[in-house]
Design a protein with these regions (language model features):
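Glycine-rich Rossmann-fold phosphate-binding loop(s) that bind the pyrophosphate
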Residues: 74-75
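Adenosine-phosphate binding glycine-rich loop
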Residues: 187, 195-214
Length: 237
């Protein structure tokens, strides 16, 4: 890294978007489970107006209570996502280096393949490293239930996008909600752009007004502390 090579101090801006990213995880989950976007579009097309009943739906609607959510990583964002899931009455499982004794009783440990095979929803919260690159691949997608949902608000290259598109198009899994892709903006030939039941947002999980204000305030605080000779959040001391 340039900061290390030049012996410059580097300060991190941690946690500014934790709540916003967890919120986006559930924005995707709820959109998929309730088909919010689809039903709103159908109402505007007049399908509810022309329906004889007081209500109208044409896709399965899924309740989150008692569903199993598997979190790949349990850092700040993963843990915040877990708390929201617990609020919905979900069963929460996580791949984490923490021991059982370090976890609240509502969160249970699982290994990676077990998460993929047993959970109804998988949400990715791990850093991108050589070990986690394309950890979501054809082999692990084949472990998932046919009604399972994959959520990625972490890093695009955690997922082999062609393998995910193939799994969606063949019905091996039900749906995916992603806020990140392997290249951004996406190339026109990205297979997820045309994949069945793939909901994509343009890397906006972090970008709530509140999170961006928090980021600027942290950056200003870091700069002021550095100028005063007492830098904060230094990662390359």
């Amino acid at each position: 890294h340039t900061a290390y090579r030049r012996q410059r101090q580097m300060c991190i801006r941690d946690r500014y978007s934790t709540a916003s990213v967890a919120q986006m995880v559930f924005a995707h989950i709820l959109n998929i489970c309730q088909q919010v976007q689809h039903h709103s579009e159908e109402v505007h097309k007049g399908r509810w107006t022309n329906n004889k009943d007081f209500c109208f739906w044409d896709t399965p609607l899924i309740e989150l209570r008692d569903k199993k959510i598997g979190l790949v990583g349990l850092g700040n964002t993963g843990y915040t996502t877990a708390r929201v899931a617990i609020g919905f009455g979900m069963q929460v499982y996580a791949l984490t280096s923490k021991s059982h004794f370090q976890l609240p009783p509502e969160i249970k440990k699982m290994d990676l393949d077990q998460l993929f095979s047993e959970c109804d929803i998988i949400s990715l919260h791990c850093p991108l490293t050589p070990e986690t690159h394309e950890l979501v691949n054809a082999r692990r997608l084949a472990l998932m239930k046919p009604n399972a949902i994959l959520i990625n608000t972490g890093r695009g290259p955690l997922v082999n996008e062609q393998d995910l598109a193939d799994a969606l198009n063949s019905g091996k899994i039900y749906a995916a909600g992603v806020d990140v892709l392997s290249s951004e903006p996406p190339r026109a030939d990205n297979p997820l752009l045309t994949a069945k039941n793939c909901y994509i947002t343009p890397h906006i999980a972090w970008a709530s007004t509140e999170a961006r204000e928090r980021l600027m305030n942290i950056a200003i605080s870091n700069l002021q502390a550095y100028i005063s000779g007492t830098p904060e959040n230094v990662v390359n001391k």
